């Protein structure tokens, strides 16, 4: 398994990854393409694709922050889900990084329940520590005069 970093939205593979991102997450959890392009310009942000040989398997978007990595999105190609690729990806990511923050929502709907189940096999612990992460969406406020 290999991870390849992408820093240019014009890259064909980035486009493939972004398409997977769009079908894998609810719209409220996504940033727009423009906001994503802004994130790519930040050296702390990593957009990596996941490969098995020549086969595109998925993506991982994460931030290198003060002493830890914050996984923002992890998605596996729909045809490969349930095959163990996601677990292997997370295992490889954990091997190359020491402190990882993986945020999941409280398990109240199908998607959050599946996410909680996926991460339950890993040595992640629940914490009450508050961290500040870069926002997913750019907020623009209009002021009327």
Name what the model sees in each region:
Residues 1-31, 35:
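Short amphipathic alpha-helix that is part of the acyltransferase structural core
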Residues 23-53:
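Active-site rim helix/loop that mediates acceptor-substrate recognition in acyltransferases
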Residues 49, 54-63, 68-75:
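Conserved beta-strand in the GNAT
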Residues 74, 79, 103-107:
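Short strand-loop junctions, especially beta-strand C-caps/beta-turns
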Residues 76, 82-95:
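Conserved acetyl-CoA-binding loop-helix of GNAT-fold acetyltransferases
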Residues 96-110:
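Conserved GNAT acetyl-CoA-binding A-motif
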Residues 107-132:
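Conserved active-site alpha-helix within GNAT-family acetyltransferase domains
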Residues 132-145:
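C-terminal "cap" of GNAT-fold acetyltransferases
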């Amino acid at each position: 398994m290999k991870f390849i970093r992408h820093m240019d939205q014009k890259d064909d593979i980035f486009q493939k990854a972004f398409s997977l991102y769009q079908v894998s997450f609810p719209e409220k959890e996504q940033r727009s393409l423009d906001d994503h392009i802004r994130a790519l310009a930040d050296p702390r942000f990593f957009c990596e694709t996941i490969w098995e040989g020549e086969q595109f398997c998925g993506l991982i978007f994460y931030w290198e922050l003060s002493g830890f990595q914050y996984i923002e999105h992890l998605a596996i190609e729909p045809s490969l889900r349930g095959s163990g690729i996601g677990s292997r990806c997370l295992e490889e990511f954990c091997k190359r990084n020491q402190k990882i923050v993986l945020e999941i929502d409280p398990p109240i709907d199908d998607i959050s329940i599946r996410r909680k189940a996926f991460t339950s096999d890993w040595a992640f612990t629940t914490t009450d520590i508050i961290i500040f992460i870069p926002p997913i969406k750019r907020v623009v406020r209009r002021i009327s005069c």
